[in-house]
């Protein structure tokens, strides 16, 4: 999945339209928007929370029939519900099952300390669904108008020891679920579901087995989630039909297992979420070994999560091959193996992004047992920065000031200085918006900082014009910029799994606190 010339041309077209018309913070994950620069481009990774795991098996119903502990989202879902002002988690637990798992619910006021409420679905437990599943995706669908379908559960259920199918359920509260409303054909295991608001489609990321590439992904989309599930079925060896398309496989330069370097990487899972102006993709890269070898060695398979981004929801830029959510090299750690992503990532908590993951302890007797839930944290927008050292540098972006574009904001960590100059379409500084006119950002670390000039507190006078924004940095990192309709700096972009103080509509707009929207 490298950037080929045709794809690059397509992305250039998309991004030119995007920067001109898109609302949302503009992230430096996207190099196609850069006209000129002499800055260094730096990829960043989250830091695991020191209090991990934030959730693990401590209830008898979280053990399977063999007594093995399970308490983590297998996709599952971790979301912030702005209406109820709490973090919500749907995770997989043993449930006394033999083949698969059941779905449990937990909640939190801060995203770090989780409680398992006693509910009435299976009295005396926090179990909310008893279908014996391989994996499950739970969506808190903030774009759904029907309140009875606000929560959606895509359950990959075991039919028997060898086959699985997907069922779709709805809920108004995330606790009490409907009977299945749609049923797929036979599938491979480890599928995932999500919503793409740019395409206005629900998406299934379907596992397939493709020759030399082995574990790979197929793509299925539909605006109706019931049709989506009903159309899903297993397809072999890089084949497609009218609705299902072959999507992608692992790259040769994806990370490999240090003890098994001869094993070619594979895609174990993939899911995605809208964040600001793009789709953020999570690629769980399998590095081996196979389950039989794991059993014989009493170890976990090595899965690590890498990230990518997309402007069209189908073609992915995966330039960074550094694990974003890695395993720990500590044999006894909660994430010693098999780290996988969770539906709802990222959540926006103040100046940070929260990423929840499932991780596995090395354990006996089963290679896939004993899993728990961890948290990793990253600066908001902090995937990639443009960095200047002691020598001043710049990055120049061509854009159009939108009709509602009143205020320019940046997300930057400035130990020295940052200034912005606005140039016309011919590359000449616009009077009143020169570097000298700019009010410097000095020795300040802000994820939302308004930029102004001595005679221009905003960019309202430039609305509708095509301009170049030249950011001058010295001893500074810039992570994002955006042009907001509001003096309070909301971007109009998508907010992932949500967060405290945000609008409950899934979009970064000013919140009417009386309505919790």
Where are these regions (language model features)?
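Extracellular glycan/ECM-engagement signal in secreted proteins
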Residues: 340-343
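Sec-dependent N-terminal signal peptides
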Residues: 4-15
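Beta-rich carbohydrate-recognition and catalytic domains
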Residues: 21-268, 273-336, 350, 356-516
């Amino acid at each position: 999945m490298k950037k080929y010339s045709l794809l690059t041309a397509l992305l250039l077209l998309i991004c030119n339209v995007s920067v001109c018309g898109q609302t949302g913070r503009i992230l430096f994950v996207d190099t196609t928007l850069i006209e000129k620069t002499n800055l260094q481009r730096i990829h960043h990774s989250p830091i695991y929370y020191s209090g991990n795991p934030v959730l693990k098996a401590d209830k008898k119903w979280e053990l399977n029939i063999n007594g093995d502990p399970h308490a983590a989202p297998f996709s599952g879902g971790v979301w912030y519900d702005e209406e109820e002002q709490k973090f919500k988690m749907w995770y997989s637990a043993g449930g006394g099952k033999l083949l698969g798992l059941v779905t449990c619910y937990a909640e939190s006021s801060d995203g770090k300390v989780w409680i398992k409420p006693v509910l009435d679905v299976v009295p005396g437990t926090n179990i909310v669904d008893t279908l014996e599943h391989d994996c499950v995706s739970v969506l808190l669908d903030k774009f759904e108008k029907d309140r009875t379908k606000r929560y959606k559960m895509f359950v990959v259920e075991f039919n028997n020891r060898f086959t699985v199918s997907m069922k779709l359920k709805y809920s108004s509260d995330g606790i009490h679920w409907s009977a299945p409303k749609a049923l797929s054909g036979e599938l491979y295991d480890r599928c995932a579901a999500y919503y793409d608001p740019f395409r206005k489609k629900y998406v299934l990321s379907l596992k397939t087995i493709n020759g030399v590439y082995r574990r790979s992904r197929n793509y299925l989309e539909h605006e109706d989630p019931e049709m989506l599930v009903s159309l899903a079925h297993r397809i072999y060896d890089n084949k497609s039909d009218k609705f299902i398309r072959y999507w992608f496989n692992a790259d040769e330069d994806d990370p490999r297992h240090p003890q098994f370097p001869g094993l070619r990487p594979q895609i174990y899972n993939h899911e995605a979420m809208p964040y600001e102006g793009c789709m953020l993709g999570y690629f769980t890269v399998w590095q081996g070994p196979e389950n039989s070898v794991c059993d014989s060695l009493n170890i976990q398979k090595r899965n690590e999560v890498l990230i990518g981004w997309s402007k069209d929801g189908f073609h992915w830029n995966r330039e960074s091959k550094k694990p974003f959510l890695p395993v720990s090299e500590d044999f006894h750690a909660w994430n010693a193996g098999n780290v996988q992503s969770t539906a709802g990532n990222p959540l926006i908590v103040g100046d940070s992004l929260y990423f929840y993951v499932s991780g596995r302890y090395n354990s006996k007797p089963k290679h896939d047992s004993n899993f728990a839930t961890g948290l990793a944290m990253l600066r908001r927008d902090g995937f990639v920065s443009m960095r200047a050292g002691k020598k001043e540098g710049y990055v120049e972006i061509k854009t159009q000031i939108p009709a509602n574009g009143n205020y320019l904001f940046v997300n930057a960590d400035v130990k020295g200085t940052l200034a912005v100059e606005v140039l016309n379409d011919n590359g000449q500084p616009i009077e009143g918006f020169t570097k000298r006119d700019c009010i410097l950002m000095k020795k300040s670390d802000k994820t939302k900082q308004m930029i102004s000039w001595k005679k221009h507190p905003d960019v309202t006078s430039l609305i509708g014009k095509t301009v170049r924004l030249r950011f001058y940095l010295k001893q500074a990192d810039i992570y994002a910029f955006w042009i907001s309709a509001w003096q309070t700096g909301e971007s109009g972009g998508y907010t992932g799994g949500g967060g405290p103080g945000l609008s409950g509509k899934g979009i970064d707009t000013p919140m009417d606190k009386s309505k919790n929207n």
